Amino acid sequence: MFSVSSAPVLRPSKVSIFSVSACQIICDGSQINWGEGKINCDERQINWGEGKIDVIPSQKPAIINLFENRFSHRPPFEFVLHLRGNFERIRALKDLLKKYEERAPEIVFEWNDLETEARGWVVINSLRGGAAGGGTRMRVGLDRNEVISLAKTMEIKFTVSGPAIGGAKSGIDFDPKDPRKKGVLERWYKAVSPLLKNYYGTGGDMNVDEIHEVIPITESFGIWHPQEGIVHGHFDPTDAEKIRKIGQLRNGVSKVLEDPNYCPDGPTKYRVADMVTGFGVSESVKHFYSIFKNESLQGKRIIVQGWGNVASAAAMELAHAGAKIVGIIDKNGGLINEAGYGLEEVKNLFINHKVGNTLEIDGMLSFDEVNASIWDVKADVFIPAAASRLVSANQLQRLVNAGLKTIASGANVPFADKEIFYGPIMSQADDQLSLIPDFIANCGMARVFAFLMSYEDRDLTDEAIFSDTSRTIYNALKKVHDKNSSLTNVSNTAFQLALEELLANPKLQKTN
């Protein structure tokens, strides 16, 4: 029973005492009225009598929207308790993130090229399990702190993809369009080859190609495969086991796909590395709908950001599952089709209108045109799979207002937050809809590396590789669902599970 009190007091420990007449919530001039008491929401806190919740200014629009859409016809105490619980979850996560971010990386290797202005860093956040892994990227302006944050991100991803190793990253501050790039990479990999031989595994990343640059250059310095350090440091194999594992890595990543279930028909040959990350993003959506909603993707409306390998492969796999692609926004332009593109149309876009990593088709909208309207298109699922830190708070809110229910992060850190992991825009998304985090949704390639290192059967099939990636993503989402079965705060829960594992077990033993 709820009693009427003359004092407008909302006590979270005794929710039966509150005023039911004439309340209002005040957010810096924006008022939502529901009765006689109020909740003050200034730039620092929400007060509800005996307690308070810290609030940052950028969260206020989301709080107002949340009330208007979900709580305007419900008792005031429910809204307060929701805010309280949500902010307490965020506070708990931020405490874990603070501990994780403040832990200094175990190894930082700094390199200065004697022939150019290039500088580079290998950051190994930890040698958890005897080794660490993370790709090599190159861009102008890259710095040590960026590489540290990426190494920490990789360590979180390995809690899902495996193996149970530390996170690492290589970064080179140099213009990838400079004709001296090849020489810079050759001198870089010569300098870091002792790490790659013993306990560090790398691969391609931004502006560094795995097949055409990383593999041939590292081979010239006696590295059997860019992941050799993980094989040696984590698995501690015999000579015969090492040869077999590295052989599987060589063959598996560059394997030409033959099964039509995992690649489109046509003259172009696609490799595992071309398709598996986008496939994993699609599987994360499919498994999420199955586990959390007991629904299929039939008829679901999808918006995709980007048209590189990840975005285009994800779109095609989602269409294969029965979804409709209603919008594509790429850096040069895009398409909007309210009726939705089906499988054959998406295949055509994938095969015939993907030039490099961009969409090119006659009659497509300019970037300004598509950017002005795509965020208001009705959709069930959004796949940000272009560059990092692109999605703004305004774009997110427009998607939500148009009915968006789910986001699967094909890109690493897709939101335009300055924070490494869980900034205010990501937090807003996580509270308003179902947000599948990047370290689950886009873990496909990392999982393939782990699978190839541990797989015992020499006959590697397309189905074996891709079904393992699918199963890994399913298990990660099931673990999240077991702790939090609601449709919101999915990323918060996933982060807490990963960070609790890393902070509790910073040093795992090698795998024998």
Region roles according to the model:
Residues 3-6, 11-21:
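Low-acidity, Ser/Thr- and Arg-rich intrinsically disordered low-complexity segments
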Residues 400-512:
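Adenosine-phosphate binding glycine-rich loop
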Residues 159-297:
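Glycine/serine-rich phosphate-binding loop and adjoining beta1-alpha1 elements at the start
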Residues 25-27, 31-53:
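Long, intrinsically disordered low-complexity tandem-repeat segments
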Residues 124-156:
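N-terminal cap/recognition module
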Residues 67-110:
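Short, Gly/Pro- and small/polar-rich lid/capping loops
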Residues 261-375:
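Glycine-rich phosphate/diphosphate-binding loop of Rossmann-like nucleotide-binding domains
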Residues 333-435:
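Rossmann-like adenosine-cofactor binding region
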